[in-house]
Amino acid sequence: MKLLLASGLASLVLMSPAMAENMLRVSYPEDPKTADVQMTTDAYTLPLNVFDRLIESETTGPGQSALVPGLAEKWEVSADGLTYTFHLRDGVKFHDGAVLTADDVVYTFDRMLNPATKALNTDILTFIAGAQDRLDGKADSVSGLKAVDEHTVQITLTQPYAAFLALLASPGASIYNRAFTEAAGDQFGLTPETTNGTGPFILRDYTLNDSQMLEANDDYWRGRPKLDRLLIRVVTDSETLRMLFESDELDVFDLDYAPTQTPYFYGSDQWKAQVRSGPRVGMYYYNINQAKKPFDDVRVRKAFQMSIDRQTILDKNFYGKGKLEDGVMPRGLACYAAATPIEYNPTKAKELLAEAGYPDGVEITLQQASNWSQRWSDMNQIIQAQVAEAGFKANIVTSDEAAFMAARKVGDSDNYTQVWSADFNDPDNFFYTFFSESGTKVRAYNNNDPEVFAAIDKARGMTDQEARCKLYQDLTSRIVDTDAAWVPLFSLDHSYVVQSRVKNFTVPWNGWSDMSYYKVEVE
């Protein structure tokens, strides 16, 4: 990693607003460590600004997106849903001046699947024919990847997968230049000198655990960004973050990194008009393990659903900034439709427990890992008190995370609460993850419903999107209402506060903190 003197960017950081006229200053609590998206699963700001993808997921409104052409100006899908043909834009250049070719695309995806790379997000490509053999070291290339000519890429899948285009719009599918990346070797993405993309910004400086400086790409194929520079600072402390923002040394304040500041900014006469908010396409939920008594009885599961006052948790723990969710798909996800509301009714829940053979109540375990943040413990304590009214005598058990994950992997953990955010905009990201035959076990739901398994597998290959959405909506009712397989809690809003000179700042469709700053302007 190239380490610059701390003073190297200090003068830029402390610039007056006038001097920093065309520079946007943002912050994140951790250093990304690399710009190589194949080597990270949770730091996407550099990849989203330095690289492009064949297809992009463009925000069209709060919690809304559309798949639009990226490096591929158009594409076709064969009638059987197996072959995707992408036609690349002519004349797209990498930051070093090299012209994008089909070979770069094939190389990028092959590099991800090459076991020597040890990439962390190979799952987005495993539907490609030959991908698993490449990952397993049984092949030297991927049979389903082909450069037809200089501007045409053909990708063949092992089976139809309706979400494949959405996967290609995820950050992990960023495209690299073969010659540059091979020359950089294992240093690729670690320094400005070893980073090269086609994106709207060029990585110019990188001070480990301090900051990254990006400059506008004058030759960007979509047109030069409005910003001249993008300064990304690493700020670990929430009080320091607020001080920097209110002293005009940062242009954007991400309330996800300082949630206790939410009442202040929403109530401040100075700042409340500068709040920008959008839904996070994700869901807090409570797991129910049907392999363990008393939750093998659907009446007990329904009672548990009805005994949790979700609105109170949202209000107490998250200042009410969100929306109750009642299904499997959170708002903003493709195919989303409002599900049947889950009633909060501890009296009826108590009756259901009695019907199930527990007239005097029943003991249950709520599990959490020792290194999880305080919010999970806070939520469990609230839920422990709430469900007691219905007759659930909940014991909160804290275990080592490794032990918890090992037990969950074989379907043996106790009930727990967690959150899942959309990696890509397709229902499969939720349904397959939690309720497929493999997913329901490794996440310890054990909702062994063959009708659900068959429907999820069918939906993955459907090409009629309207019919596919209808199937997912019917599945929601089956999973949440009929099987009572989990407790959907709520989705949150993601709020930012921006300086008044910041224009065209839009919360990404998925509500992530990581975003492209291509369209943002400063006055």
Where are these regions (language model features)?
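Detector for C-terminal structural segments
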Residues: 22, 162, 207, 307-336, ...
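Alpha-helical secondary-structure segments
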Residues: 25, 101-110, 150-156, 160, ...
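N-terminal lobe/hinge region of extracytoplasmic solute-binding protein
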Residues: 27-79, 194-198
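Gly/Pro-rich hinge or "lid" segments in bacterial periplasmic/extracellular proteins
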Residues: 58-62, 139, 150-151, 157-225, ...
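Aromatic- and charge-enriched surface segment that lines or borders ligand/interaction sites
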Residues: 73-121, 154, 241-244, 294
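Surface-exposed binding/hinge segments that line
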Residues: 87, 106, 113, 117-179
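Short helices/loops that flank or line small-molecule/ion binding pockets
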Residues: 97-98, 104, 239-250, 298-299, ...
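Ligand-site clamp/hinge motif
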Residues: 189-192, 217-264, 384, 393
